[in-house]
Regions:
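N-terminal strand-loop element at the rim of the active site
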Residues: 6-13, 26, 30-77, 169
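Active-site proximal beta-strand in glycosyltransferases
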Residues: 101-104, 115-134, 160
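A conserved mid-protein helix/loop that constitutes part of the nucleotide-sugar donor-binding site
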Residues: 14-22, 196, 200-219, 236-242
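Short hydrophobic "strand-cap" motifs at the C-terminus of beta-strands
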Residues: 6-8, 162, 182, 198-207, ...
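Donor nucleotide-sugar binding/catalytic pocket of nucleotide-sugar-dependent glycosyltransferases
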Residues: 149-188
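Membrane-proximal helix-turn-helix segments that form the acceptor-binding/catalytic region
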Residues: 88-92, 140-159
Length: 246
């Protein structure tokens, strides 16, 4: 069996990229399994995680960042051109590789149209975010785009979510399955719970909501002065969060 994963790039040490590395390496080590990973904006940068030598990579070299200029008209034209280029290059690889399953990690542009490619493979969306992250987007145009995308999910063979709660949030769709993230280690000892400390671990980005955690902690801290909050992680909002902490 051959599986192809689609993801924009693997240049950050983030959760989704880590899970992809874990699963791809595991699958590539199984007898009779082939794994291919397709990016479109890797830009010759090194991979953030180690991957098995058995895994093959393609980069489609599509620079969607060029569609974010000041001229709205040319942005639209470029987006159309780059999308067509993306579709053509990806379909060429799928027809060449003949995968059994093609997966979109749901952060790339291909999620909008992957189901339309007629290469014969099963098309799967793999969601690593909560349903509500798609519901809480700001702006009329962005909300319209999200609604349009959500209406396309029914055309995919499967939508993979992480938990039973996620499955319920997505509603009554027959093509939803639950596959939790892999656990690569299990603690040998349990904490003795003697230290009054809360630890939060994650990428310091808007998606993780550390700003809300800090705001809530500021309200409850006076009632629990012995407790400490420790945030572990890095990301684009580190300076902003440090200023919020003061």
């Amino acid at each position: 069996m051959k599986i192809i994963y689609n993801i924009p790039n693997i240049i950050r040490m983030a959760g989704m990229e880590r899970i992809l590395a874990i699963k791809a390496n595991y699958l590539a080590g199984l007898t009779g399994m082939e794994v291919v990973i397709i990016t479109y904006e890797q830009k010759n940068l090194p991979l953030a995680f180690d991957f098995s030598d058995k895994i093959r990579f393609y980069d489609l070299d599509i620079d969607y960042a060029a569609c974010r200029g000041k001229n709205i008209f040319w942005n639209k034209i470029r987006r159309i051109i780059y999308t067509k280029r993306h579709q053509r290059r990806l379909e060429e690889i799928l027809l060449k590789e003949k995968p059994d399953i093609t997966i979109s990690m749901m952060t790339g542009r291909e999620r909008e149209w992957l189901y339309r490619l007629k290469d014969g493979s099963k098309k799967i969306l793999e969601c690593h975010f909560s349903y509500f992250s798609y519901q809480n987007v700001k702006g009329i145009i962005n909300r319209y785009k999200i609604k349009r995308f959500l209406n396309k999910i029914k055309y995919y063979d499967r939508l993979v979510v992480l938990t039973e709660e996620d499955r319920k949030d997505w509603g009554r769709k027959d093509n939803i399955v639950v596959i939790p993230n892999a656990l690569t280690f299990y603690p040998k000892e349990s904490a003795d719970l003697s230290i009054p400390r809360v630890i939060a671990v994650g990428r310091l980005s808007a998606q993780k909501g550390f700003d809300r955690l800090i705001a809530i902690w500021a309200e409850i801290e006076p009632y629990f002065p012995d407790w400490k909050l420790t945030i572990i992680g890095s990301g684009e909002l580190q300076d902003t969060l440090e200023r919020q902490i003061g």
